[in-house]
């Protein structure tokens, strides 16, 4: 059979797209892109063009049908809308690990939960120990938060040498930490939850369960139920990105059942496709049916959770997370007067609680749980890894800034708290990277020394 030679331009295009695809799946690169976006936001927000930065993210964006219209700022749609997809991917990863990975054991799943509680309690107590004025004591929850996107991005800078279970442990801990932070916001910084929203969310969840029961595998069918879950959680007053976590945890971890094994179906449809392609009077329309069935069999070969993660990963890593960083990392430092005693202590307390309180709480509680025999360290995780996770958990960034906006009324204290969060996040990132590099080198040296020559 004569081999068809592809045009040179098409060869170059295919090679370029293949290289681009490999590039997009390198997590270290996604971490660099994320940090570049954060630095750009900080420079922009403190430059002569700062007004344009604020104006851009406050631009209203409206969705609606007929008289039913919902309008919010671009900043809202990024933080509460797009980031739901990030949390969806996080929920899927946690679901996989609970099913067959590092969190599949109850004793192992308990450890990140306990560590997260320690990582919330110790920073809060450390902040309060600075003896603030009563108004500034309201900021106790600012250092309890962990910015998942930034912490995972910094961890990605250490590359593939870091065991995957360390990333899973950080994700599990940060998710629990974030849920605690959202509950703190709901119960301490708002008028409480509106329970009518839970009814709306329940309708969406029942629709998802119904679609799964009848074997619907197309992701598009779950967009509307997912949107209803998101809307319901939004109506409760809780952070709507929790909808992503819930839906991610509900994603099936086993492939959809078929009448025949997917590999057998792929072999049969491939043979049928080749037979029709070699027909002397070939009609392109004759190839559509076997191609469609072949794509369906290929799709069903993988569990939905694996398939969805692979599809969404590049969009989250190189689209959603950098946009999120650009929209949230731009904190204006003008007007922060640190000569006043109150703001001084707020900044110091927030910074110390994040940089020291987070690792202290996470490591100490983890050690205590393991020491008492209530938990075990997950596979491939040692105490150096726990310290690394503790240091990276000190990156409070956007979530801490969000809580600060709710906690402080005085502009001076608010500005000082933001400065403390930014300083602590930078220090925690540098300490985490330094510790991670040292840990990797120590492990490599120990491995080399122990290997036979």
UniProtKB/Swiss-Prot annotation:
TM region(s), chain numbering: 23-43, 74-94, 111-131, 139-159, 168-188, 191-211, 214-234, 235-255, 316-336, 345-365, 386-406, 419-439
Catalytic activity: Na(+)(in) + 2 H(+)(out) = Na(+)(out) + 2 H(+)(in)
GO molecular function: sodium:proton antiporter activity
InterPro entries: Na/H_antiporter_dom_sf, NhaA
Superkingdom per UniProt: Bacteria
Keyword Heme part of the UniProt annotation: no
Name of the protein in its database record: Na(+)/H(+) antiporter NhaA 2
Organism field: Pseudomonas putida (strain ATCC 700007 / DSM 6899 / JCM 31910 / BCRC 17059 / LMG 24140 / F1)
